[in-house]
Amino acid sequence: MNYEAVIGLEVHVQVKTASKMFTRVAAGYGHAPNTLTDPVVLALPGTLPVMNKAALDAIIKAGLLLGCEIAPVCKWDRKNYFYPDSPKNYQISQYDQPICLGGAVEIELPGSARNVMGEHKKIPLTRIHLEEDVGKLNHESVDSLVDYNRAGTPLMEIVSEPAIHSAEEAFAYLTSLRATMIYGGISDCDMEKGQLRCDANISVRPVGETKLGTKVELKNLNSISFVRDGIAHEIKRQLAVIERGGTIVQETRDYDGQTGTSQSLRSKEMAHDYRYFPDPDLMPVVVDQAWKARIQTTCPELPFDKQRRFFEQYRLPYTLTSVLVWDRELSDYFEETVKIAGADKAQTVGNWIVNDLLREIGTARVPLADAKVRPAHIAELVKLIDAGTILTNAAKEIFVEMFATGDTPAIIADRRGLKAAPTDSNELEQWCRDAIAANAKAVAEFKAGKDSAINAFKGPVMKAAKGKANPKLVDETLRRLLAAL
């Protein structure tokens, strides 16, 4: 019997705000333990929560970016449980009236090759709700220490429908969702800092069956790669249990990304175990059209939309768009460069950024914002090549020095004597005549309509010119002489 996997993901995203969800104490990471706290965070008697409007703005933006329905009214609920990471013994969350409903995350599955676009599909969402984060437990040899710095930080929970059917789809979903949150300025989504955390609910069922199988929740998925690997492992584990005639038990399992194994933690709790009820200290939130319209004006173009536009507007190939669009700063850098160099030079600009700029940045380990090469540098380099002032090989050398020094291409070319030498027109024409005379086959192919056959003559001409001839003049001269034959 053939089986299919059914996967739903619960993704927690820390919202990037200056202060916490229900108090004005600062939100942050990397501070000394328990220094980002106050009476509200520590749940001291008599304290009352006050909503953070910036966090509400952020979740509305997330909902708009993902095509959710923004509820006109949402409310706050208390999720009751006892654990040391929650001083109140409950978490303020949203239960039956979340702020965002529906929506979808567009994903791209791997193509047949790295330079081939894969299938696109949309993974539907159930909801997005806002809550407060909890503290962090640090387990030592004999003690467990509690750090409440994270407690109270605004946290979005993004819940997908059980519509993911493979580990690769889950990987693509998280990659796309993370990029959306970063593009929107909603979160930095640094998994090492706990800014993006994911739990996976996984079950298997016979192909064609509509009823869901018994689900297992997988936790401790500390990277997007671990999510993919953990899901693949859990699918194999469940299939092995079924093949042995066993029964899948509803439980929570801990995945160890280092060993590629998982172990049972506990039986899965049901929602009613938390005894949700409305928080009496917080009023419902009313989201009117004016509020949504204001947030809509701040929503950026998302990666896949930008990828489609780059192809339509600039005719960029997938090999370039698949790199450029996933970093908003990089795609903005590209468009700023194209604005200076000209839209007709977009592919050339893209090649310099993807192949040369990213290589130098990776080698130097500096962020793009700190790179000395700015859009104007690359635009000037492209114009110098196009004018025949410098040749491509020289431009490669110039780029490396330009990255190291921040000097303009023209200054470097003058300083190092890398400008193309002026070529005597009579001498160039003779070199072209000699190349044409020596290759009758290429002449016949060119005359028969094979335009690329002209390249067979360029090598001998450049060799005769010792690499200093202007490629544009070489091409023009060859075409003129061939047309006259």
Swiss-Prot record:
KW Nucleotide-binding (keyword) present: yes
Pfam families: GatB_N, GatB_Yqey
Biological process, per Gene Ontology: glutaminyl-tRNAGln biosynthesis via transamidation; translation
Catalysed reactions listed for this entry: L-glutamyl-tRNA(Gln) + L-glutamine + ATP + H2O = L-glutaminyl-tRNA(Gln) + L-glutamate + ADP + phosphate + H(+); L-aspartyl-tRNA(Asn) + L-glutamine + ATP + H2O = L-asparaginyl-tRNA(Asn) + L-glutamate + ADP + phosphate + 2 H(+)
PROSITE patterns: GATB
Record InterPro entries: Asn/Gln-tRNA_amidoTrfase_suB/E (IPR017959), Asn/Gln-tRNA_Trfase_suB/E_cat (IPR006075), Asn/Gln_amidotransferase (IPR018027), Asn/Gln_tRNA_amidoTrase-B-like (IPR003789), GatB (IPR004413), GatB_C_1 (IPR042114), GatB_Yqey_C_2 (IPR023168), Gln-tRNA_amidoTrfase_suB_CS (IPR017958)
UniProt xrefs under SUPFAM superfamilies: GatB/YqeY motif, Glutamine synthetase/guanido kinase
Enzyme Commission numbers on file: 6.3.5.-
Protein name per UniProt: Aspartyl/glutamyl-tRNA(Asn/Gln) amidotransferase subunit B
Enzyme class: ligase
Function, as annotated: Allows the formation of correctly charged Asn-tRNA(Asn) or Gln-tRNA(Gln) through the transamidation of misacylated Asp-tRNA(Asn) or Glu-tRNA(Gln) in organisms which lack either or both of asparaginyl-tRNA or glutaminyl-tRNA synthetases. The reaction takes place in the presence of glutamine and ATP through an activated phospho-Asp-tRNA(Asn) or phospho-Glu-tRNA(Gln).
Molecular-function GO terms, alphabetical: asparaginyl-tRNA synthase (glutamine-hydrolyzing) activity; ATP binding; glutaminyl-tRNA synthase (glutamine-hydrolyzing) activity
Keyword terms: ATP-binding, Ligase, Nucleotide-binding, Protein biosynthesis
Recorded family membership: Belongs to the GatB/GatE family. GatB subfamily.
UniProt subunit comment: Heterotrimer of A, B and C subunits.
